[in-house]
Amino acid sequence: MPLDTLRIATRKSPLAVWQAEHVAALVKARHPGVRVELVGMTTQGDRILDTPLAKVGGKGLFVKELETGLLEGRADIAVHSMKDVPMELPEGLCLPVILDREDPRDAFVSNTFKSLDELPRDARVGTSSLRRQCQLRHDHPHFQILDLRGNVNTRLAKLDAGEFDAIILAAAGLKRLGFEVRIASEITPEQSLPAIGQGAIGIECRENDPEVMALIGSLDDPDTHVRVAAERAMNARLNGGCQVPIAGYAELTDADTLRLRGLVGEPDGSLILRAELSGPRAEAEALGRAVADLLLHEGAGPILAELGLGPDADRS
C-alpha cells in the first residue's frame, strides 16, 4: 500500500532544515499526492557547543537520535550531511540515496581579507574541523587556529563580532543558506582536501520499508553515490573518526574512472600523509580500501593508533 505521508527526521539547525525541506520538495515534485512532515530532533552534537568535537569523541554525534527515530517508527526517513554519517549503520537501517553533490570545497570567509595568502602571520582563523586545522597548521604555522562551534549563522556572527580575522566553512552550507556572498574565496582541494562526503546529502531509511524506498529511490544521483562510496570505503578501512584529521575526495575523471585522493595527518599539522589512485567506478569501494592501504603503508597507522583508532582498534 503506497504511503500517503512521509515523515522526515531532521536536526533543527537552519542548514539541516534546509536539507530536509529540499528533500521534501524533491519528493513532492515526483509524488504530488504525498504529504511530507518534518520531525525535528536534537542530537548530542547540537547539545554540546562548548567543547571541540574532537574532544567529545564518539560516532554519530549528529545522527544517532535521528536513527533512533527511524528504528522506533517515529520517522520514515532521516536526512543527513554525509560528512556526519558514521561508516557503520545500525542494524536494520540503510542509506539508499545520496543526492547530487553541491560544491565540496572549503570556503574562506573574511570581512577584511580575500584569501588565506592575504592573512597576516598571526591571523586568528576559526574552524571546528581537525581536518582543516591540521592542513592550515601545516601550510601556515604562524596562524592562530582557534576552535569555532555553532551553526552557520552563529559562526558568521562570531566573525562579524571581531572574534576572528577569518573563518573556514563548507562552501556547500553557505551556498544552500543563501550566504554565497560571504565567501571571499573557495579553497582548492590542493590547499585543503575536503571531508569525506562533504557537500553531499544522504537519505537513511529502514531496510524493510519498500514503500519508502519506492518514494525516494529516484532521488539518488549515481555519480555522487559512487564518489562518496569510494571516500567512505577509505575511511572505513582506516576506522577513522573526528578525533583525527582524515580527508578524502573522489572525482570522476571520465564516465567510468574515479580518482581518489586521501589524507591523514597529525592534529598539530606536523605531519601530513597523502595518497592517490585512479580506478574503475565499478570498483569504487576497492579503490577506497586501496588508498587507505597506501596511507597505512606511509605511516598512518601509528597516528590513528595513538588516538585509539585505525584498522586494529575496537569498533564498538
Swiss-Prot record:
What are the record keywords, sorted? Porphyrin biosynthesis, Transferase
What is the protein's known function? Tetrapolymerization of the monopyrrole PBG into the hydroxymethylbilane pre-uroporphyrinogen in several discrete steps.
Q: Which Gene3D superfamilies match?
A: Periplasmic binding protein-like II, Porphobilinogen deaminase, C-terminal domain
Lineage of origin:
Bacteria, Pseudomonadati, Pseudomonadota, Gammaproteobacteria, Chromatiales
Which reactions appear under catalytic activity for this entry? 4 porphobilinogen + H2O = hydroxymethylbilane + 4 NH4(+)
Report the source organism: Thioalkalivibrio sulfidiphilus (strain HL-EbGR7)
Similarity comment = Belongs to the HMBS family.
A Pfam match is Porphobil_deam
Q: What is this protein called?
A: Porphobilinogen deaminase
Q: Which GO terms describe its biological process?
A: protoporphyrinogen IX biosynthetic process
**Annotated positions of the S-(dipyrrolylmethanemethyl)cysteine modification:** 242
**Domain of life from the UniProt record:** Bacteria
Gene field: hemC
